[in-house]
């Protein structure tokens, strides 16, 4: 019998216990032994819950319990999660987490601590919810050099952009709808301002390129400035607007990395990824394109990914899975030097003159009074920003390459 402890008994933590109990026979066959939730750490009590009598409030009762070999962290945030996970690893316990904030901020350090104590620090559920992407990057895609990772990494914003596109709703209305459905938090900033996607693309980039990418180095724009008028133009163009997290390897060994809304055509592999679904596109020099698609969030999909890490640790307790990070921090290039084509909306009616300045490939009319849209030539961000200062620009959306 393998005993596990769960840190944090909220949505994901209770989902983990639910999966462990509901699928205990299947899990036992795959793990080679029965896996039992021995206790949960939480300041709250849970009368009537299946774990009612197994709630502890002191982390030392877990770190000092020799019968507990695997710890599952689902608390979220970095305080006190970081201190608790560090203590568990130092106590010789494998740790599986769904906490993207923890992994993005402290991943390299926790991996080194795990390595020093001959245990594993596993975080499959920290990026794609139920999408298996971490292990393929670490274990499966090892014979090829990854050149790019692009993903729709946040279900909340993808749902909102889908509703804006399909129903013609404006931002405020679709945010309220997402909150009523439980897709968006009461304070939605982490999702709608792109911070969630930024942490996820930083984690994926670190694994894909083998060196720690600091999420704070990733230039980020959210979806708060996207309007129904932008979608009117997108419809004319046969395009959709998505929030992408993208990183690309450069010839000098650095990477470019960005989170921002992009306009994509139906030729793009992520065009049909709608509603709360997520997808991650991995490009390699030899393998071409690989796509990972599924539920990027949610109680049971995320819990299932956490339990998969637990099963792996249980099945191979003496094999420590360590992501191959090189020492130091990856250099992320200045986003102002990156090159894009842009969709730009401009006030006025003199489209031809403005189009000439932007070297526009196309003038777009969406039937909106006193403005027009352009598809520009490629410009660096610096060059484009300087051009925009000369005109009454309403909005700008980059075109996905």
Regions found by a protein language model. Give the residues of each.
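A short hydrophobic/small-residue beta-strand
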Residues: 94-96
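Rossmann-fold NAD(P)-binding glycine/threonine-rich loop
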Residues: 81-87, 91, 100-138
């Amino acid at each position: 019998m393998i005993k596990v402890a769960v840190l944090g008994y909220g949505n994901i933590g209770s989902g983990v216990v639910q999966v462990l109990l509901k699928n205990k026979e299947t899990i036992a066959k795959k793990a080679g032994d029965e896996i039992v939730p021995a206790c949960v750490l939480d300041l709250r009590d849970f009368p009537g819950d299946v774990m009612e009598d197994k709630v502890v409030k002191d982390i030392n009762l877990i770190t000092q319990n020799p019968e507990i070999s695997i710890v599952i962290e689902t608390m979220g945030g970095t305080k006190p999660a970081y201190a608790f996970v560090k203590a568990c690893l130092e106590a010789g316990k494998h740790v599986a987490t769904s906490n993207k904030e923890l992994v993005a901020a402290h991943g390299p350090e926790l991996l080194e601590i795990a390595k020093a104590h001959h245990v594993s620090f596993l975080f499959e559920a920290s990026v794609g919810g139920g999408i298996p992407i971490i292990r393929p990057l670490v274990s499966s895609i090892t014979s090829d050099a990854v050149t790019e990772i692009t993903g729709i990494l946040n279900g909340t914003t993808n749902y909102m952009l889908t509703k804006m596109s399909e129903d013609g709703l404006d931002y405020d209305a679709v945010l309220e709808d997402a909150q009523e459905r439980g897709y968006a938090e009461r304070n939605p900033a982490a999702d709608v301002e792109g911070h969630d996607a930024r942490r996820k693309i930083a984690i994926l980039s670190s694994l894909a390129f083998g060196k720690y990418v600091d999420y704070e180095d990733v230039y980020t724009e959210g979806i708060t400035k996207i309007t129904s008028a932008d979608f009117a133009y997108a419809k004319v163009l046969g395009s959709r607007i998505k929030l992408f997290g993208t990183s690309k390897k450069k010839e000098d060994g650095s990477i470019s990395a960005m989170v921002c809304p992009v306009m994509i055509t139906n030729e793009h592999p992520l065009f049909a990824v709608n509603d709360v679904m997520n997808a991650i596109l991995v490009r390699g020099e030899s393998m071409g394109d690989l796509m990972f698609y599924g539920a990027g969030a949610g109680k049971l999909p995320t819990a299932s990914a956490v339990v998969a890490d637990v099963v792996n640790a249980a099945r191979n307790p003496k094999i420590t899975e360590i992501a191959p990070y090189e020492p130091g921090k990856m250099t992320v290039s200045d986003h102002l030097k990156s090159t894009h084509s842009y969709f730009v909306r401009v006030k006025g009616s003199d489209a031809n003159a403005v189009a000439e300045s932007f070297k526009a490939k196309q003038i777009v009319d969406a039937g909106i009074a006193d403005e027009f849209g352009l598809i520009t030539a490629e410009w660096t961000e610096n060059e484009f920003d300087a051009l925009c200062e000369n005109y009454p620009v309403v909005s700008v959306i980059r075109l996905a390459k």
